[in-house]
Regions:
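Glycine-rich phosphate-binding loops that contact phosphosugars or nucleotide phosphates
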Residues: 1-140
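Internal, active-site/partner-interface "lid" segment
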Residues: 112-116, 134, 145-171
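Generic intrinsically disordered, low-complexity segments enriched for polar/acidic and small residues
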Residues: 22, 154, 177-178
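A structural signal for alpha-helix termini and helix-coil/disorder junctions
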Residues: 42, 145, 149, 179-182, ...
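Acidic, Ser/Thr-rich low-complexity intrinsically disordered segments
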Residues: 163-187
């Protein structure tokens, strides 16, 4: 189950999922992070979670700076030791962890790789993927718990497979899609 008002802002050209060499240029271009915050109309009623393993590239730092300018709380998920090891690329001399309101350390290794292969000079095997997903899920579950404790009923989608086990799941999810359709661009 996922909160209905949780929106992943996955800018394809910046994620490295496609055209990985292009992502290097995008994540190190001034203005991209600010543009993403402005384009998605993020407001102070929202909270922005920015994930950058090194925390040193320009776009995530710019996104955090722009969010803070707009009064939006920022949570950073980053590898603190790795970030400290590297020099920031940002002209203001700041890193993501310096700008964020809350920093969650994914404890990823320097270089984001752990496995040594015999006769190969480079380590492989990311150490950030699983902790990043885990930390996001911790944030989401804590958010739901806090809202319930304060007397709110959070909007949470049922897992799609639950429609086969509980009659009103599909209707429940459809109502949430209708509620957030114009607010969340990737619905």
């Amino acid at each position: 189950a996922t909160p209905a008002n949780y929106c992943a802002l996955l800018e394809p050209s910046a994620t490295g999922n496609q055209e990985i060499t292009k992502s290097y240029f995008i994540e190190n271009t001034y203005g991209i992070g600010s543009l993403i915050v402005d384009y998605h109309r993020i407001t102070p009623n929202d909270c922005m979670i920015i994930i950058s393993n090194s925390g040193n590239n320009i776009a995530p730092v710019d996104a955090a700076i722009r969010a803070k300018e707009k009064g939006i709380p920022v949570i950073a998920i980053t590898a603190v030791e790795y970030s400290d090891y590297l020099k920031t690329k940002h002209k203001d001399g700041v890193k993501l962890k310096d700008v964020a309101d809350i920093v969650l350390d994914n404890c990823s290794l320097i270089g984001d790789a752990a496995v040594e292969i015999e006769n190969f000079d480079m380590k492989v095997g990311s150490t950030s993927t699983i902790p990043n997903v885990y930390l996001q899920n911790c944030i989401l579950t804590q958010m739901v718990e806090i809202l319930v404790e304060r007397g709110f009923e959070p909007d949470v989608y049922y897992n799609g497979h639950m429609a086969f086990m509980k009659e009103d799941c599909a209707d429940h999810n459809d109502k949430l899609v209708d509620k957030y359709f114009y607010r969340i661009r990737n619905l």
